[in-house]
């Protein structure tokens, strides 16, 4: 006898997704136009390459990074692509509407596509905490709310604190982490008895997740430098990120071996620890004056990530119901906080070096930005979690958590489940 849960998704998903897509097409028809300026060909190619790197990070990197579940790897990869495609469309419109007053035609440029892709990346980070417990209709709601909340944070911080695009982007780590953890806290937590093994990682899916981590590792310098305008700052960001993630790999392997009683290396530790340096230096990557400092940050971040992978999953599983293998959000929250602290220290150093006496004011500004982003992330995440609990979304039953068979057609299982 087949389950009733796929049938409910079949009724809700096409209506919801296609109606939303039709609405987006109409909005693009009435309110958007392409940039008609004659851009330098060399600059156009360079800008496209950065955008291409971001798309690879999002579609392949984060898509496969979340695919380590034993019975939920198909959904993790495909749902991530679905959220990316939807999130980019909505983010382009939202960023255009919020950046101009009174609202008019949204001019689409390669830079606006890069900005929209970074907004969609926020969803791919936060969804790690809830994948396996929600269906695509709920993910549609989550994408719309989170992209809107992040766009609002960017606009408010930019207007109040006069912050540039790069600094707004670097709040994404903390924002996405706390948003995802807040949503997870509102969802049903424990798995039913007899199904606890479904949220465990398996060998082949874990290898796919490592493939995603490798793509992220290769393209993280492009992500940290994507929205910087100055060529010198972009160069510094690329160099410092490269050194930081290189040290993170060495630290991840060594720390994982050290954390195991028999000195064995854990693949689950590797998935996020190899990226730790890139997250930690993201906020200040263009300000770090020397490679040794970036390398030290990569070392510290790698140790924090390995320690978090060892000790945080038990706490997150008990309190938030997050699977032991889904520690990206909790890791990114600590690493993002470390990055914010390093940025404040470097800003203070720069202020003293230039003889500017307003050190306290600069520190208060940075703390204000961080506090505002965190507050909006927690608030909007809680509201989203409560919204996703409504019965109208036809959420999968707890017994069907972390199960591809709820959503996918398996030719060798014609009878159902």
Curated annotation (Swiss-Prot):
The chain crosses the membrane at residues 12-32, 44-64, 77-97, 125-145, 172-192, 203-223, 238-258, 265-285, 287-307, 331-351, 358-378. Coiled coil: none annotated. InterPro entries: Ammonium/urea_transptr, NH4_transpt_AmtB-like_dom, RhesusRHD. The lineage of its organism: Eukaryota, Metazoa, Chordata, Craniata, Vertebrata. SUPFAM superfamilies: Ammonium transporter. Pfam families: Ammonium_transp. May be part of an oligomeric complex which is likely to have a transport or channel function in the erythrocyte membrane. It comes from the Eukaryota. It comes from Pan troglodytes (Chimpanzee). Its main location: membrane. Belongs to the ammonium transporter (TC 2.A.49) family. Rh subfamily. One of its GO terms (molecular function) is ammonium channel activity. Keywords: Membrane, Transmembrane, Transmembrane helix. PANTHER family: AMMONIUM TRANSPORTER (PTHR11730), BLOOD GROUP RH(CE) POLYPEPTIDE-RELATED (PTHR11730:SF43). The keyword Transmembrane applies. It is a multi-pass membrane protein. This is RH-like protein IIR.
């Amino acid at each position: 006898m087949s389950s009733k849960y796929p049938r409910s998704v079949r009724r809700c998903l096409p209506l919801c997704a296609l109606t939303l897509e039709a609405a987006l097409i109409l909005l693009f028809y009435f309110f958007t136009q392409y940039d008609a300026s004659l851009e330098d060909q060399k600059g156009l190619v360079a800008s496209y390459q950065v955008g291409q790197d971001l798309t690879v990070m999002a579609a392949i990197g984060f898509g496969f990074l979340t695919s380590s579940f034993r019975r939920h790897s198909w959904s993790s990869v495909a749902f991530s692509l679905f959220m990316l495609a939807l999130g980019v469309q909505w983010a382009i419109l939202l960023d255009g509407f919020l950046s101009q007053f009174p609202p008019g035609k949204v001019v689409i440029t390669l830079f606006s596509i890069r900005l929209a892709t970074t907004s969609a990346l926020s969803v791919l980070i936060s969804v790690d905490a809830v994948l396996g417990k929600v269906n695509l209709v709920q993910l549609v709601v989550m994408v719309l709310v989170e992209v809107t909340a992040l766009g609002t944070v960017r606009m408010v911080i930019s207007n109040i604190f006069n912050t540039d695009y790069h600094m707004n982007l670097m709040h994404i780590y903390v924002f996405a982490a706390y948003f995802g953890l807040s949503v997870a806290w509102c969802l049903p937590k424990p798995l039913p008895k007899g199904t606890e093994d479904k949220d465990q990682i398996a060998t082949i899916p874990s290898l796919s997740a490592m493939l995603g981590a490798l793509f992220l590792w290769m393209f993280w310098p492009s992500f940290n430098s994507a929205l910087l305008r100055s060529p010198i700052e972009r160069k510094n960001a690329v160099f410092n990120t490269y050194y930081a993630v290189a040290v993170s790999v060495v630290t991840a392997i060594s720390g994982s071996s050290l954390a195991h009683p028999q000195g064995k290396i854990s693949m689950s530790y590797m998935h996020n620890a190899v990226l730790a340096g890139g997250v930690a230096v993201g906020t200040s990557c263009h300000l770090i004056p020397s490679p040794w400092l970036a390398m030290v940050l990569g070392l510290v971040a790698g140790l924090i990530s390995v320690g978090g992978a060892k000790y945080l999953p038990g706490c997150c599983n008990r309190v938030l119901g997050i699977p032991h293998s889904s520690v990206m959000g909790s890791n990114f929250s600590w690493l993002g906080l470390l990055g914010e602290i390093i940025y404040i220290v470097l800003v203070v150093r720069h202020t003293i070096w230039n003889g500017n006496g307003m050190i306290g004011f600069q520190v208060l500004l940075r703390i204000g930005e961080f506090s505002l982003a965190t507050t909006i992330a927690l608030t909007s995440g809680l509201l989203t979690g409560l919204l996703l609990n409504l019965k109208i979304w036809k959420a999968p039953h707890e017994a069907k958590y972390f199960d591809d068979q709820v959503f996918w057609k398996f030719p060798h299982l014609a009878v159902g489940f």
